[in-house]
């Protein structure tokens, strides 16, 4: 089941709540659109289509490693008291087009947008370590980029990651309520010279406050310890 199927399923689940807004994309992009879940998309930054050229004997273990890392990242991150009431709806799985995690708020106090941004940043941190380690050992690895959006904007975010996303970058496309959840924790910047309404609405993660980055570093280390223990086992 590839990423597009998962994304389509996510969108279908969400269509009903947006029918009242009319079918045009602009209404769906309304800054006050309601949301109680976010989608985190992780895609490989693979300019030369190297992944599909790899022999399955190399590609499949690499995708399995990425899947394992992402699932451990979700499990460890959601133990954080700050993210109480946020849960993962699916078990993410990497294929050539990346992976997709849907997080939902189980109550009105749960900071699901913050959880999405923290998960995206955490995976990018982990991926960079694995990437650098693999390259050092002359093994295959790719940099990644990530997008965090509400479910109404999953497709738009896929396009944004392709058109404006740079390697190791995180793009964010959320309604006001979501931006409000993350404002105190992260710095955001705008897309330079936007050419579409989505590019204009999109924000680029430009760093987190010390407390958040420290928290993420702790979770990253916990995930890497699990990884090392399993490798030795």
Question: Where are the regions that the model predicts?
Answer:
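Intrinsically disordered, glycine/charged-rich C-terminal tails and inter-domain linkers
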Residues: 1-35, 160-233
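Short, surface-exposed beta-strand/loop "edge" segments at domain boundaries and coil↔beta transitions
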Residues: 48-54, 109-111, 154-158, 179-183
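Short C-terminal domain-edge/linker segments immediately following a structured domain
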Residues: 70-77, 131-135, 177-180, 203-205
């Amino acid at each position: 089941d590839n990423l597009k199927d998962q994304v389509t399923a996510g969108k279908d689940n969400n269509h009903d709540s947006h029918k009242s807004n009319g079918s045009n994309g602009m209404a769906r992009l309304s800054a006050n659109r309601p949301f109680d879940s976010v989608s985190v998309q992780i895609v490989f930054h693979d300019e030369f289509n190297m992944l599909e050229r790899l022999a399955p004997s190399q590609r499949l273990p690499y995708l399995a490693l990425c899947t394992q890392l992402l699932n451990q990242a979700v499990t460890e991150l959601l133990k954080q008291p700050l993210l109480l009431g946020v849960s993962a709806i699916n078990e993410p799985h990497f294929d050539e087009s990346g992976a997709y995690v849907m997080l939902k708020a189980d109550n009105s106090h749960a900071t699901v947008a913050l959880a999405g941004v923290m998960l995206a940043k955490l995976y990018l941190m982990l991926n960079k370590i694995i990437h650098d380690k693999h390259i050092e050992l002359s093994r295959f690895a790719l940099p990644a980029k990530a997008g965090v959006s509400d479910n109404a904007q999953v497709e738009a975010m896929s396009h944004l990651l392709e058109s404006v996303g740079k390697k190791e970058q995180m793009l964010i496309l959320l309604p006001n309520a979501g931006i409000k959840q993350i404002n105190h924790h992260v710095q955001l910047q705008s897309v330079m010279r936007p050419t579409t309404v989505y590019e204009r609405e999109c924000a680029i993660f430009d760093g987190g406050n010390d407390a958040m980055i420290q928290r993420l570093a702790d979770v990253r280390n916990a995930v890497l310890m699990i990884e090392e223990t399993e490798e030795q086992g």
